[in-house]
Amino acid sequence: LPRHLSILILSKELVSDPRPAPRTSLFWVIAGIVVVAFSLRAPIIAPTAVIANIQADTGLSSSGAGLLTGLPILLFALATPLATRAIRRFGPETTIILCLTGVMVGTVVRSLGSTSLLLGGTALIGAAMTLGNIAIPVLIRRDVHWNKIPTVTGAYSAIMNIGSMVTLLGTAPLAALMGWRWAIASWAVIAALGLGYWLARMRRERAVQAALPSPVAVSEKSPSPTIIVRGASSAKTGDLRLYRRVVALLIAAFCGQSAAYYATTAWLPLLLSESRGLPQTSSGATASLFQIAAVIGAFGVPLLAHRTKLWVATAVVAACWVSLPIGLLLAPDAFMVWSILGGIAQGGGFTAIFSIIPRVATSDSLMASASAKVQAGGYLAATFAPSFAGWLNSSTGSWNAPLLLILGLTLTFSVCASIAARITERH
């Protein structure tokens, strides 16, 4: 309880605590997060490496091909209420098992045959990933000490980016050896390995739980402790007000973060090809720096937050984000620098946002609710941002308008995330 509350305990005969849940070591917590994170983005990326093969084999139109990446992102937004209910009913561990099972099955179904199976499997993957998107922050908040949350969140963000990069690099060579169907289906092995880990971990934790002594029965004559907490009601109200204010700011911040990320990912290669005259291979390689540099941001935020404050790290990320569109507008010849800075920002921005939420979420339920609201808003914005940026380009015949859109989105992240980080550290 906060120091200013006055606590009066009228009876010292306290009831014995129920059996505590077995505590998982930090190593195994991180290991569990890593095996899930690898499967939370990679299956979406895999088809993009062989999209021409898929279209030639299935007759999928360009708009249908866009659904292979757009549909999961839309489901990230629409399926968050389902994920929240699953966590409340089954707990985060079982929800993660459902997530990995869905990703594994969806990845296989997607490669089986017709266009309907291709899109149906993709939808299943998106819905299953949403379960993991919400469950992982809940696990981090519950099992990780608060001062290590940014580090573990950074590892989570970094592994998602590494998984995407590995999948992007590996799918095309696999397709050359065995065809695109086997190539994209092969990534189900990663989800299967993660599923095996989590099933074994749950069995172990249940065995440890069963071996713990039963709760001490309380005699009917034993008086229950009477605790009078003066000011507790007002403190709780104040905490909820802070929680709601921070969550509202983070919803806006993640809208800017996600929309800027997906718009940049969709159009940066073409932008560099058309505006700087780069060949397709060079523009793609330069754009890949935007993805790879995310690992620096994911780990850089917790390191900087440890040495200074989280709001300082968030402000640095904000400056890097804003430099991407401004740099491409004012100094386009330095596009490699701006791509790297933007990549650092997109990895660090995710880490910063999901390191702020646990500071105001005082329970697993509040954590799940906040994570769901933030991700629903962010991914809904991300669903429409690439199309809107493309429309701006075709309407104006220039990349200036899409870059101004990305500037507005990154400024939204910068202002809202920085304010949220600052006010949480004041309380």
Regions found by a protein language model. Give the residues of each.
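Residue-level signature of mid-helix packing/kink "hotspots" within the transmembrane helices
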Residues: 45, 73-81, 164-165, 291-295, ...
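Extracytoplasmic gate region of multi-pass secondary transporters
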Residues: 48, 245-288, 295
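Conserved MFS/SLC helix-loop-helix module at the cytosolic interface between two early adjacent transmembrane helices
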Residues: 78-113
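Helix-loop-helix hairpin linking two adjacent transmembrane segments in secondary transporters
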Residues: 115, 146, 156-206
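Paired small-residue
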Residues: 116-124, 337-342
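Cytoplasmic helix-loop-helix junction between adjacent transmembrane helices
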Residues: 123-158
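C-terminal transmembrane helical hairpin of 12-TM major facilitator-type secondary transporters
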Residues: 309-353
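A late C-terminal transmembrane helix in Major Facilitator Superfamily
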Residues: 364-398
